[in-house]
């Protein structure tokens, strides 16, 4: 597995969950002897929704909601077999979306 790279992208709505997951991944990779770059915070995506409160009149009465999607990027530069096995066994929080790509 030399000369390969594992790129891990994490997405979550809660920044505490994503930070906890990134520390678990980085500690696991370093424990197995791999070189880690990151976590790199990517731009947070903010989606805003405006909803009319009144069903009939009062166009001025509106509520605004926002969903923030936090993203992190981790590169594992020189993974070993132990690193891949440890990352596969790692149990992360339920609210974190993980995308793994080999390159």
UniProtKB/Swiss-Prot annotation:
GO terms for biological process: translation. Keywords: Ribonucleoprotein, Ribosomal protein. GO terms for molecular function: structural constituent of ribosome; tRNA binding. SUPFAM superfamilies: Ribosomal protein S10. The keyword Ribosomal protein applies. It comes from the Bacteria. One of its GO terms (cellular component) is ribonucleoprotein complex. PROSITE patterns: RIBOSOMAL_S10. Involved in the binding of tRNA to the ribosomes. Part of the 30S ribosomal subunit. Belongs to the universal ribosomal protein uS10 family. This is Small ribosomal subunit protein uS10. It comes from Buchnera aphidicola subsp. Acyrthosiphon pisum (strain APS). The gene is rpsJ.
